Amino acid sequence: MSIDESSLGLIGGRYRLDHYIDRGGMAEVWMAVDTFLDRKVAVKLLKPHLANDAQVAERFRREAIACAKLSHPNIVAVYDCIEFNGRQAVIMQYVQGKSLRNLLDKQKRLGPNLTVHIGTSVASALDEAHREGLIHRDVKPGNILITPEGKVLLADFGIAKALDSTDADLTNDNIMMGTAKYLSPEQVRGKPLDGRADLYGLGLVLYECLAGRVPFVGESDADTA
């Protein structure tokens, strides 16, 4: 991790980092406490080397603003977007539980009832996003969270894109984005996308839940895609 926990004060004057959770391709995630509302939140910090890239930082900020418009029980909520030490930070709902990826790694495959529950929950979340003009572009088990009570939430709209986006300088349809095993054919080819790409990815996830593997497997991620 790139932050010294012992040196931290309040981020944005109200969020106190508690402990490091995980990191992805663009950001690192921390659990924090909102000292104003006395509740746990997740803080997603853009990685330092990306924070120095003005285009990436601006895309990160714009996507946070777009995702903050989403209000749905199966979508991880975005509360705030701030800057900390020159890095963009998104304040999100903290979800206690584990990812579908963790569950599949442990159990290999799931029963039909749980699979249907996951599928309907994520489909409902995607319907809300698509109605608001956002496509997720990275529907995969690692971005599907399950609470101890069994609630399913779709997380990480980190590479989401507005369906009507014209920011050619900030995101390029000719660049393949997403996780190889769960990409739609149009994503593989770098073609323009709509909500059907997300539904294709969800279908691959549900196939894996039932079969214990994805339907298409190559020797490498590139071959799989």
List each language-model region with its residue ranges.
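Protein kinase glycine-rich loop
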Residues: 17-24, 29
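Activation segment of protein kinases
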Residues: 6, 52-55, 148-192, 219
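Activation segment signature within eukaryotic-like protein kinase domains
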Residues: 118-119
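Protein kinase catalytic-loop region centered on the HRD/HxD motif
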Residues: 122-134
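Activation-segment/catalytic-loop signature of the eukaryotic protein kinase fold
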Residues: 81
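AlphaC helix of the eukaryotic protein kinase fold
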Residues: 45-69
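Conserved short submotifs of the Hanks-type protein kinase catalytic core
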Residues: 85-99, 103
